Amino acid sequence: MQASSDRILTSHAGSLPRPDSLIEANHQREAGKVDEAAFQKSLSAAVGDVVRRQVAAGIAVPGDGEYGKSMGSKVNYRAWWSYSFTRLGGLKVTGLGLYDFPVRRSSPGNVVLSSFGDRRDRLRFAEAYGDRDSGVSTGPRATDWPVCVAPLSYTGHAAIAADIANFKAALAANNVAEGFMTSIGPGSASRIGNDHYKSDEEFVFACAEAMREEYKAIVDAGLILQIDDPAIAENFDQINPEPTAEEYRKFTMPRIEALNHALRGLPKDRIRFHLCWGSWHGPHTTDIAMRDIVDVMLRIDAGAYSFEAGNVRHEHEWSVWKDTKLPDDKVILPGVVSHATNVVEHPELVAERVGRFASLVGRERIIASTDCGLGGRVHPQIAWAKLETLAQGAA
C-alpha cells in the first residue's frame, strides 16, 4: 500500500457518480433488454473514463467508482450492498422490500438486529423521514429483498473477473501504479433474511466464507482490497431498544471474527477497511460514538482504516486519536470531505482537517479521503468538485 512522507496522498471511499448512459444501461440490463457484449464494452469504457477523471482531479489512489456494482437510478444508497445479491448462491427473492421485514426487539442478554423500518433514528424523526420534501432521504424504496434459503456459495466469479480486468486496463492506460476495489464485508452482507442457518452468527460466518473468494480475487490481481462493512458501526441504530456500548461491542465481535476469518492468509498491507454510520441523508442522532468502537475496528486484520471525519455528526471525533494508539504498521484514511452535504468544502478547511490527524499520527500515516462514497449521494458535478477540493486541501 502506498505511503509518502513527502506529501499527503489522496483517495476516496469507493462509489463515484455513474454517467447517465451507464445508469440507463444498468436499468435496461436489469429488465433483460441489453445485449451483454455491448454492455460490457460500454462498462469498460466508463471505468476507463472514471479513472482518468480521478487522476485529473488529483486522486493518488483511485478506484473503479464501483461501476461494476449495478446502479439503475441516479440516487442510490445501496449498490455497494445489493450487488452481492447477484453474486451469492442460496438466496431467494421474497417480494418484500427492505422496510417490510418483521420487527425484532432486543432484550437483556439477547441483542438482535431489528428491521430497517424499526431503526431508532427513523422512529425518532418519523415525520422527517416520511416527508419527501424534508431533505431526509434513504434513496428509492428497495424492493425484492432476498432471504437465504440454502447454503451460501460465491457465484460472482465472472463478474469480479470482468471488474478486475476493466479496472486494471484503466489503471494501465492512465499510468497509475496502485488502485483499490471494494467488496462487501460479512457483517453487512448478512443483513438480509435468513431461513437456512441456525443462528445469526452461523449466517455471518457463511457470508464471510463465501465472500472470501471475491476478496482473494482482488488481492491476487495486485489491487488494494477495501472491505465495506458499515454494519460494524451502523448496526447500533438498528438495535431496539438501544443497547449499552458494552452490549454492542459484544454483539459486534463475532462479525469482526468472521471478517478476519475471511481475510486469513491475505496480506494486511493490501487491505483497507471502511467504517461508516450509513450514508443516507438523515439526522444520525443514534450513531454510536467512535470512541466506543475504535478499538474494535482496529482488531480487523487490515493495514488501513477509512472512516467518517468530515461531517457535522462525526468531525469532532478526530480527538479520539489523542488517546488511541494507531499500530505502527497501520495507516488511516479519514474522511475530510463529505457525502452528507451539497456544500463543497473549502481547501483550507480540508487542510485543517488533515492537519489535525497529522499532528496525532504523522503525515506519512494519512491518506486523505471522503467520508463515504459520493456516487448516488450528491450530484455528479458536486461530487467531482469535492474530489478536486480534497486534492487541493491535501496538497
Name each model feature, range by range:
Residues 1-395:
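Domain-level signal for soluble alpha/beta catalytic cores
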